[in-house]
């Protein structure tokens, strides 16, 4: 795309650069002295603690299919590839992938759709200024690769950066005298700048899927499946806090816990469908029972 716009191609970054250097500036990172593998987990404005995250996937019956344990400061979308590849390699029959808003990225939407599967992702609230024009109020012109603002101004495609973001700009001389300039968020020169991802069409398709009856019905099952897995793991299997140090030890511990949860669910199913359960269920229930404590 950059060559079509007369721009130089983006050169690959040097792999030998220091990891803690970004754009010529050093970055600071909070590290635990007790467990350096743990990461600072931030949730909301008040919750900050060193933790691990178990990125988990399950089927519609609540059986855990795969898990990827990372430090608490690793975003869900970063750990997604490892979980997705692990599950799809073992269960090729997967057709629908239901996830929360943390996985709503262009890459994830593109990957799932190109694999012939259907992603189900939730609605995400618009976080911009409510008094200004919304992104969906700009009409896209595929012929000229430009956007038309509500007042008729044209935003031309000027460049594409290394993050896959397309930048569209208006002509300052044409928008400087616009009476609605404050509503579009133009700068002092009267120029409106708008960015969109090169894979935005995949997110648009995900939005269309979300509004279907199938998409609404499948997403409501999250609270009955994966959220129940998390609840049982924390409340019944002591997974609210880790008892080990180091990523390898925590990964083994989480995997063993999930294996036990799967076996427990399978045992309950086998008992409910057994002949002995049917016989005992038919017996009178007014007999005195001896309490058992565990």
For each feature predicted by the language model, list its residue ranges:
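Anion-binding and metal-coordination hotspots
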Residues: 1-294
């Amino acid at each position: 795309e950059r060559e079509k716009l007369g721009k130089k191609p983006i050169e690959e970054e040097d792999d030998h650069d220091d990891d803690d250097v970004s754009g010529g500036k050093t970055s600071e990172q909070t590290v635990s002295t007790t467990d350096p593998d743990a990461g600072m987990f931030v949730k909301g404005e008040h919750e900050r603690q060193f933790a691990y995250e178990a990125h988990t996937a399950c089927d519609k019956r609540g059986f855990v299919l795969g898990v990827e344990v990372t430090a608490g400061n690793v975003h869900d979308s970063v750990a997604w590839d490892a979980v997705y590849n692990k599950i799809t390699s073992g269960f090729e029959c997967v057709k629908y992938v239901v996830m929360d808003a943390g996985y709503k990225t262009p890459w994830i939407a593109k990957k799932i759709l190109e694999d012939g599967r259907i992603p189900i992702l939730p609605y995400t609230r618009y976080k911009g200024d409510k008094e200004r024009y919304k992104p969906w109020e700009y009409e896209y012109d595929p012929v000229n690769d430009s956007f038309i603002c509500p007042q008729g101004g044209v935003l031309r495609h000027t460049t594409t950066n290394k993050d896959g973001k397309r930048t569209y700009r208006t002509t300052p001389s044409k928008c400087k005298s616009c009476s609605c300039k404050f509503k579009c968020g133009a700068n002092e020169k009267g120029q409106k700048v708008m960015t969109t991802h090169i894979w935005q069409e995949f997110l648009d398709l995900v939005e269309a899927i979300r509004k279907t009856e199938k998409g609404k019905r499948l997403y409501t099952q999250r609270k009955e499946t994966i959220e129940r897995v998390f609840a049982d793991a924390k409340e019944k299997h002591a997974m609210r806090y880790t008892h080990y140090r180091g990523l390898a030890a925590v990964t083994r511990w989480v995997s063993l816990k999930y294996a036990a949860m799967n076996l427990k669910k399978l045992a309950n199913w086998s008992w409910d469908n057994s002949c002995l359960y049917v016989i005992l269920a038919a017996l009178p229930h007014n007999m005195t029972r001896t309490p058992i404590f565990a």
